[in-house]
Amino acid sequence: MIEQLNEILNSFKTKLKSVKDLNDWEELKKEFIGKDSNLTTILKSIKTISNEQKQEIGKLANQIRTTIIDNLNNKQEELKNKELLIKLEKEKIDVSLKNSSLKFGSKHVLNIVIEEISDIFTEIGFEMVSGTEIESDLYNFQKLNLPLDHPARDMQDTFYLDNNLVLRTHCTNMTSRMLTKLASLKTDDNNLAVISYGNVYRRDDDDATHSHQFMQIDGFVVGNKISFANLKWILKYMCQRLFNKDINIRLRPSYFPFTEPSVEVDVSCFKCDSKGCFICKKTGWIEILGAGMINEHVLKLNGLDPTKCSGLAFGIGIERIAMLKFNISNIRNFYENNVKFLEQFKFYSE
């Protein structure tokens, strides 16, 4: 039986050399380790031989079977790689060929709006930053006058992560970071104007006007004797530049934890000249953003002295502006990668 086992191994090695493809490989596998193979028959018959031979023959038979399986696996990998190379060679593409039907992409409509707003503010001296989308509770809430037990935290359903981290609920997190950085400089020159932009996240149910992820631009100015009149001028200047019309703005009292006083900013309807339409809901006004004077507590929490400086702040929803500018009714259109929808804005990106 030992001679028979050695003959099986030698025969396998000889036939393995002649295997050219996976079909040959399958036949070889069936012949040497299949259920009807000689090796399998020997392994089944070991229980019938004497105890003296059982250990020696059983050990040798299993070693040969392991050797055959290892060689089959290596050969299979070799054949698969060979077939892949042949397939790749057949499918090789000549990248030097010209394609007359090549289509060029364009800027996404949200990037168009971001660049337009950024240009408006950088032209009047604002610095532009982006910041991090994963933020600490400290900068996202606590340094913005939203301590752990503040009821206003319920205004924003938050995605909480581990280790007191959150997905930022607003770009105002960069306001607290930049104010803290300004305070660390310990200088008498507390003048700073910054806009920050990027994705923000809230646990909203997605529908035509809401999304769990959307984009914002936040801005703030701090310095000596910054007043509400400065805020009103900035807001009107931005709205007139953004909508390319001599529109009016209306400020309504509101509440934001990090500003006092706080206002909701409406613009006179640029679609119907304030006569009343479906865009402005027959009111002649369109709600567009929130703003206010930076709360004194926020200045203190970030290391600044409210007796020596003051500030203003505002927050703009990018999707909101894009929907108004381009008559888009469903916020989900921005994120569905529908080429027909996106191609409409190619003209604006050229």
Swiss-Prot record:
Protein encoded by which gene: pheS
Location in or out of the cell: Cytoplasm
Keywords linked to the UniProt accession: Aminoacyl-tRNA synthetase, ATP-binding, Cytoplasm, Ligase, Magnesium, Metal-binding, Nucleotide-binding, Protein biosynthesis
Top-level division of the source organism's lineage: Bacteria
Co-factor remark: Binds 2 magnesium ions per tetramer.
Broad enzyme group: ligase
A GO molecular function held by the record: ATP binding
Protein name: Phenylalanine--tRNA ligase alpha subunit
Organism listed in the record: Mycoplasma capricolum subsp. capricolum (strain California kid / ATCC 27343 / NCTC 10154)
GO cellular component annotations of the record: cytoplasm
Catalytic activity: tRNA(Phe) + L-phenylalanine + ATP = L-phenylalanyl-tRNA(Phe) + AMP + diphosphate + H(+)
